[in-house]
């Protein structure tokens, strides 16, 4: 997301600016390919955003930079599901790359379904990680026959630059 907002995705327009002799038209619609175009302005991107479960506000004057689009949305609808938003943008970029390198075209419904599944899995994994685990109960037990237990303790005192050991 930060690459798209800083306009450093390797789009055709950015590659051309960096001196690579390349046509900078979008493979899907023929318009100039920039991050803002791929992730928002392209007809295909608009179709994906349209079928997504996000209820996005209308962004007037269609900004060219993706960061401006993100700011507009955050100001007009701060309670948006940002995880869905970010994964949708990421999926649009991945779809562009897949097409560029010989992959198959996915329709907007399929992309939004994959976005929903990805975010659902992400949330489930994070939910299971966030549950605090109870520390195991520590209780003394008699050692096995032929074994000995030794209890030890160490304390370090920084101020006096000393330590103590107990066995």
Residue ranges of model-derived segments:
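Primary recognition of RNase H-like, Mg2+-dependent phosphodiesterase/nuclease domains
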Residues: 1-167
């Amino acid at each position: 997301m930060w690459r798209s907002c800083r306009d450093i995705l390797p789009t055709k327009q950015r590659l051309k600016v960096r001196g690579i002799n390349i046509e900078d038209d979008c493979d899907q619609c023929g318009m100039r390919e920039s991050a803002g175009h791929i992730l928002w302005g392209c007809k295909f991107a608009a179709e994906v955003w349209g079928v997504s479960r996000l209820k996005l506000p209308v962004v007037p004057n269609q900004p060219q930079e993706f960061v401006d689009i993100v700011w507009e949305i955050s100001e007009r609808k701060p309670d948006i599901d940002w995880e869905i938003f970010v994964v949708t943008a990421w999926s649009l970029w991945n779809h562009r790359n897949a097409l560029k390198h010989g992959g198959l075209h996915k329709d907007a419904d399929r992309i939004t379904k994959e976005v929903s599944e990805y975010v659902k899995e992400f949330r489930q994994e994070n939910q299971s990680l966030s549950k605090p685990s109870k520390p195991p109960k520590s209780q003394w037990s008699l050692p096995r026959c032929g074994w000995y237990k030794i209890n030890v303790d160490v304390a370090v005192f920084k101020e006096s630059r000393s330590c103590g050991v107990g066995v």
